[in-house]
Amino acid sequence: MSEIKLIVGLGNPGDKYTDTRHNAGEWLIERLARRFNVSLNPESKFFGKTARTLVNGKEVRLLVPTTFMNLSGKAVGALASFYRIKPEEILVIHDELDLPPGTAKLKQGGGHGGHNGLKDIVAQLGNNNNFYRLRIGIGHPGHRDLVAGYVLNKPSPADRDALEKVLDEATDCVEMIFRDGMVKATNRLNSFKI
């Protein structure tokens, strides 16, 4: 199994989007940066904010694209190409409509499920979808016509509380990947309930 060398948190740039559901991936990267005691700094050649850290003696890069969500692949592709990071060495963290708030799932590969950030990353990695995903449940508004407005709005206080709890657990589980391996971290995160 490949080691994770790049962890990407998806979101939209700008204060207006900071607290919206679509930025759940970025929220987790910010927690990881605090956990690993590093700062995310703008790096224009990677179209995002990046940090480099050592986790259990292994070099890992954190990335938050500063492009809009549907262009996330531009940042991921640029950094992965520059550092010769393979798709299977990448973990992408993103919001997931098909999971309820307070849940998260880790998996490798799969489709994009209509998520425009994932769609662009797959395209920019040469149509390779073999990267890992950490999907943070944000719930579904009930009808597909409501999705765009839903993901670009703030979660309710109850949902935000559930998200905070699962983000704490996910932070521990990402760190666990480097200590105990992907299988143990996946089993722990995928069975988490609040």
UniProtKB/Swiss-Prot annotation:
One biological process term in Gene Ontology: rescue of stalled ribosome
Active site: H22 (proton acceptor)
SUPFAM superfamilies linked to this entry: Peptidyl-tRNA hydrolase-like
Highest taxon, organism lineage: Bacteria
Site positions (Discriminates between blocked and unblocked aminoacyl-tRNA): N12
Family the entry assigns: Belongs to the PTH family.
Record's protein name: Peptidyl-tRNA hydrolase
Organism this protein belongs to: Haemophilus influenzae (strain ATCC 51907 / DSM 11121 / KW20 / Rd)
